[in-house]
């Protein structure tokens, strides 16, 4: 609610100390972690704003400095990542070399594309991809590729349709930046945009980003032109983090192969 021209305050998680806030034109959403002091102390910090309290069933509680979920620390997952990534890198090495040569022959510039993405805990890392566009974009104005995007090269369209451009991320897996399965990492500009509009967005940082994920095998692959599409992807990411198991990882990997045979959302 709004009173006397002040924005309303929505306590998303009844806890303290305050973790972070997100704002919109008419609401301040307050996130918090563990209840370590009386709720009245937390509300005292908001004394200049009218306050509405309400439960949230969507928020996956963030625990700064606390234990990470199993998906982030299970040794079996890391062993599977390293062994599988090493084997796949050796298997696809000839294909990657041919793709890199085709990229260099078609357009000037490097064969590899590097971009900052958010990893485990939101820590930045440099993601690796085969370059599929004529120009390199980064920063606050980075734009997602659209169907018929004239920035994408002819070779790039082939690589993107079969997700071959993502194969260099096997090196990210070997380095520990990523996992075979997990939430797909987004450009930092997109992280900033969607985290301001989706309160539970940051929960996806509780797992290493993946080459593939539950959202992708559910058909949520490709661009996210609307906030609602991103909400669906985030819901799948949180579902994966909360219900992770090694067996589920294996099933997602197996389901990824047939999902690559359709190019409906690959452009």
From Swiss-Prot:
One Gene Ontology molecular-function label: glycosyltransferase activity
According to UniProt, the reaction catalysed is: di-trans,octa-cis-undecaprenyl phosphate + UDP-alpha-D-glucose = alpha-D-glucosyl di-trans,octa-cis-undecaprenyl diphosphate + UMP
Membrane-related topology note: Single-pass membrane protein
Q: Provide GO CC annotations from the record.
A: plasma membrane
| Record keywords | Cell membrane, Exopolysaccharide synthesis, Glycosyltransferase, Membrane, Transferase, Transmembrane, Transmembrane helix
Alphabetized InterPro entries for the sequence:
Bact_transf
Membrane spanning stretches? 83-103
Q: Which domain of life is it from?
A: Bacteria
Recorded hits in Pfam families, A to Z, give: Bac_transf (PF02397)
- Identify which top EC class this enzyme belongs to: transferase
Q: What the protein does?
A: Is likely the initiating enzyme for holdfast polysaccharide synthesis. Catalyzes the transfer of the glucose-1-phosphate moiety from UDP-Glc onto the carrier lipid undecaprenyl phosphate (C55-P), forming a phosphoanhydride bond yielding to glucosyl-pyrophosphoryl-undecaprenol (Glc-PP-C55). Also possesses a weak galactose-1-P transferase activity.
- Give the free-text miscellaneous remark of the entry: Complements colanic acid (CA) synthesis in the E.coli mutant lacking wcaJ. Can also partially complement the O-antigen defect in the S.typhimurium wbaP deletion strain.
- Which protein is depicted? UDP-glucose:undecaprenyl-phosphate glucose-1-phosphate transferase
Q: Write down the species.
A: Caulobacter vibrioides (strain ATCC 19089 / CIP 103742 / CB 15)
